[in-house]
């Protein structure tokens, strides 16, 4: 994952969750030089939640702690796209990069949006957004909740898309060793 700020937010969420303090400590996550709207978007997306529901971070964290299924789309647009929304849709790299026409400009809302019915989660828009306002939701919480449940066996496979998700130093060989 190239977005170091997003990864930093995710690391803070994992720390809070592992201590059992996610719901109570979620609003204490702060990043320098980041507006609250974008930070909330990063926090929500890192917990596999939608950022613009209007709910408090504490309520969103509680919902994430009880979730056992991944949601769709796996792509979120976070923060304010005011710099981009002024441009013609043909000029927007995120829109033109999507092979499924799932990213579009919502001029009324002043945002870039994801059409959940069209999005296949390829991540091309994530790579195309130089402002790091489009991120892939992290499916960590549903997996942790399934593993904790222990009512049914959990089997997992790893997709090739994991490459780069854990930093450049995590190679496929290291991943195979870790999963054994």
Regions found by a protein language model. Give the residues of each.
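Short amphipathic alpha-helical segments, especially helix-boundary/capping motifs
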Residues: 70-72, 116-120, 151-156
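N-terminal [4Fe-4S]-dependent radical SAM core
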Residues: 55-105
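Short, functional N-terminal and low-complexity linear motifs
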Residues: 62-65, 109-114, 143-148
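Short, charged N-terminal helix-start/capping segments
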Residues: 39-69, 93-94, 120-126, 160-162, ...
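Iron-sulfur cluster-binding cysteine motifs and their immediate structural context
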Residues: 83-115, 120, 124-140
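Generic signal for short, ordered secondary-structure residues
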Residues: 76-77, 108, 122, 158
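Iron-sulfur-associated redox domains of electron-transfer enzymes in respiratory
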Residues: 1-50, 137-180
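Short, contiguous strand/loop micro-motifs
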Residues: 81-82, 112-113, 161-166
């Amino acid at each position: 994952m190239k977005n170091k700020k997003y990864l930093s937010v995710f690391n803070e969420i994992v720390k809070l969750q592992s201590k059992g303090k996610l719901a109570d400590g979620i609003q204490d996550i702060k990043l320098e030089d980041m507006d609250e709207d974008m930070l909330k978007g990063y926090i929500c997306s890192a917990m596999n939640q939608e950022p613009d529901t209007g709910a408090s971070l504490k309520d969103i964290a509680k919902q994430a702690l009880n979730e056992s299924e991944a949601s769709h789309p796996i792509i979120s647009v976070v923060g304010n796209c005011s710099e981009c929304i002024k441009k013609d849709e043909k000029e927007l790299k995120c829109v033109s990069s999507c092979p499924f026409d799932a990213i579009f400009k919502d001029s009324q809302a002043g945002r870039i949006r994801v059409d959940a019915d069209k999005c296949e989660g390829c991540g091309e828009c994530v790579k195309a957004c130089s402002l790091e306002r489009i991120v892939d939701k992290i499916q960590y919480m549903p997996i942790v909740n399934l593993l904790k449940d222990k009512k049914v066996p959990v089997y997992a496979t790893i997709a090739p898309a994991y490459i780069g998700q854990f930093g450049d130093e995590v190679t496929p060989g290291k991943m195979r060793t870790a999963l054994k």
